[in-house]
Amino acid sequence: MLNNNDIWSKVPPILCYCCASILMTVVNKFVVSGAHFSMNFLLLCIQSTVCVVCVATVKKFGIISFRSFDMQDAKAWFPISFLLVTVIYTGSKSLQFLSIPVYTIFKNLTIILIAYGEVIWFGGRVTALTFVSFIFMVISSMIAAWSDVSSGLSGSVPATIAGAVRGLNVGYFWMLVNCLTSAAYVLAMRKRIKVTGFSDWDSMFYNNLLSIPVLAIFSIVVEDWGLENLGRNFPAETRSFLLTAIAFSGAAAVGISYTTAWCVRTTSSTTYSMVGALNKLPVAASGMLFFGDAVTFGSVSAVGVGFFAGIVYAVAKNNQKKTEGRLQADAIIPLASRKP
């Protein structure tokens, strides 16, 4: 039985994880929602640089530890970092065109892709209850898309309908690419971690460090670095605040990694997955609160169904873990029962 002190000791890491997750999503949405913002690669390069500086600083104070830079490890990990660049870039482009509730709900589809990827490449298993949660995830995404299109077109004059539809189509394209690359990143990283033996902090350090040159090159080659475009992306009246927000979002990435490890260590992976499912509700609500995302029956229903799907998924994974644990225990033959 847990006493009150044990219960209350688990509250801070859970709250910190939720706050870090909400802050990161809201700040990223704020940065990319500028009327003329187009320098996503530069944004991500700054975030990764801040992240590496923060992690190195925290390591220097002895709060965390991870292995020092090694060229062989870097070569082995570079494909994973490149995949991460595509994940973060497509995610930022999705947020640029889609509302936070829609983005949050559609991220659930990545779980389905990862689950069946694990079935194909790692001998994973999808239980009946897990499949039910997947059905609800798909339904919530369909409701979100319907609500998003309806609210985007309602009240639009005929001349602007084509532009609204085009913007939504671009947003859903980036969301699809983001789901595919996110699943590929997670599955490839799982395989690579077994080869390199990386810890969570090792992965974070190498991911961000190796992504900096890639992002910098893409930014220089693809993006317009002319003074006029820089002025549009970083207006003089909001430049300081915008750069501070970008730096803060990079630090928030470190916060999410730390609070994730803290939450899993002080509670359990099951509690963490449940918190992640429940946290989708305040993340979606933050978009409605801070960015004026449409609060309609469809949008609220989509968030509710997605919220329920997350809970069902967390329960399904918990049950599956317990079942697999029992099967492993049953497979162990006691020494006293073995025949000579």
UniProtKB/Swiss-Prot annotation:
Keywords: Cytoplasmic vesicle, Endoplasmic reticulum, Golgi apparatus, Membrane, Sugar transport, Transmembrane, Transmembrane helix, Transport. InterPro entries: TPT_transporter. Disulfide bonds: none annotated. The keyword Lipid biosynthesis does not apply. The chain crosses the membrane at residues 7-27, 37-57, 78-98, 102-122, 126-146, 168-188, 203-223, 241-261, 272-292, 295-315. It comes from the Eukaryota. It is a multi-pass membrane protein. One of its GO terms (cellular component) is cytoplasmic vesicle membrane. Its main location: Golgi. Residues 28-36, 99-101, 147-167, 224-240, 293-294 are lumenal. Residues 1-6, 58-77, 123-125, 189-202, 262-271, 316-340 are cytoplasmic. It is found in: Golgi apparatus membrane; Cytoplasmic vesicle membrane; Endoplasmic reticulum membrane. Belongs to the TPT transporter family. SLC35D subfamily. Homooligomer. Involved in the import of GDP-mannose from the cytoplasm into the Golgi lumen. This is GDP-mannose transporter. It comes from Laccaria bicolor (strain S238N-H82 / ATCC MYA-4686).
